[in-house]
Each structure stands twice: as C-alpha cells, then as structure tokens.
A protein has these predicted regions:
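Acidic, polar-rich low-complexity tracts and alpha-helical solenoid repeat scaffolds
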Residues: 1-186
Length: 186
C-alpha cells in the first residue's frame, strides 16, 4: 500500500484510491484475460471464481467490477444456471452501468435473452451490440444472427434487411453465401 503523508484533508478520490486493495493499474486486465481464457476453455467454474474474485477485489472501481459481473453472468448462462444469471442481471439493472462496461453487458444480455427464448429483447440488445462492434467479420456474424432472430419472430422484412446488411459488409464467401440463401428463403 502506498504511503499517503499529506497533512491536508483527503478528497473523495484520494479516499477511494487508498481504499483499493490493488494499486497496479494494469493488473485487472491480466485477471480479466485469465478469466476469459478459462471461460473459452470451457472451465466455467474456474472462470466464475476468477470473476467473483475480481468483483470483490475491484469493488471500488465500477467499470472493472461491472465487466467482471458481465462475464460472471456469461459463465452462469453457459452452465444453464439462468436463475443465477438473472439475479446478477437484475442487480445490474438496479444499478447504473458504467459506460466502459456497456459493451460487455449488451453481449451478455443478448446471450441471456436468446437462452431464455425472449427473442424480442434479444434483438434489441443485439442491435446495440452491432452499433458498438468494430470488427467487420464479427459485425457480419451479428447481423446474420439478428436476421435469424427476426425470422423466428416472423418479421420477414426485418430479417431480409439484416441479411442484406451481411452482404453489404463483404464478408468471407461462406458467410455471404449463407446470407444470400437466407434472403431467398425469407
């Protein structure tokens, strides 16, 4: 813990900084990377414990803690524990989401509502995900998924427009081919 020997009264920002348990400004990225690697490896219990530890460790820094909460909810969703994921999501909705954690939450909410078969809300959050996505191939995949969601909701025109967006993004051949086939089926 760093020394703080100023004689004056501490500001709120200084109090928050001194109440932290971790002072390395880049270590949270290592924790997040470790949890994500465990998640993608399929070790959801290990990933959930890593993200739970991150939430406790960085509780004074909302942007980091909320990212970890989003990934913890993803772990629960992948394990089929929708009730636990819903508990985290309702807690998140009660509090305001930090703008730096918004993208992770949109991904998580999209995944949750797809698993819960609430396709209307999934489409709303998937639209938000598409707005923030920078990678062209990933954006094409998300538009394709949005087209599939609209198809399952019997919104044929919206599905057609979503598949048309996939073709506009000039994705790899197999993605474009599947989008054109889906356009002809709608």
């Amino acid at each position: 813990k760093p020394d703080f020997t100023k004689e004056r009264k501490k500001t709120e920002r200084e109090k928050e900084w001194l109440s932290r348990k971790e002072y390395n400004p880049f270590l949270w990225k290592a924790w997040l990377l470790m949890g994500r690697s465990q998640f993608y490896k399929g070790s959801f219990d290990e990933a959930a414990s890593t993200f739970s530890y991150m939430i406790r460790l960085y509780k004074t820094q909302p942007s980091i803690a909320q990212r970890a909460k989003a990934w913890l909810a993803k772990c629960y969703i992948e394990q089929g524990w929708l009730y636990d994921a819903e508990e985290i999501i309702s807690e998140m909705k009660r509090d305001s989401v930090h703008w730096r954690a918004q993208k992770e939450w949109n991904y998580t909410l999209t995944d949750y509502y797809i698993r819960a078969k609430n396709y209307d809300l999934a489409a709303v959050y998937l639209r938000k995900v598409i707005k923030t996505e920078m990678r062209r191939l990933q954006k094409a995949r998300e538009w394709y998924l949005l087209g599939q969601l609209y198809e399952s909701l019997n919104q044929k025109e919206n599905a057609f427009n979503a598949y048309k967006q996939v073709v506009k993004l000039n994705p790899p051949y197999h993605v474009e081919f599947n989008a054109r086939i889906a356009m002809s089926e709608v």
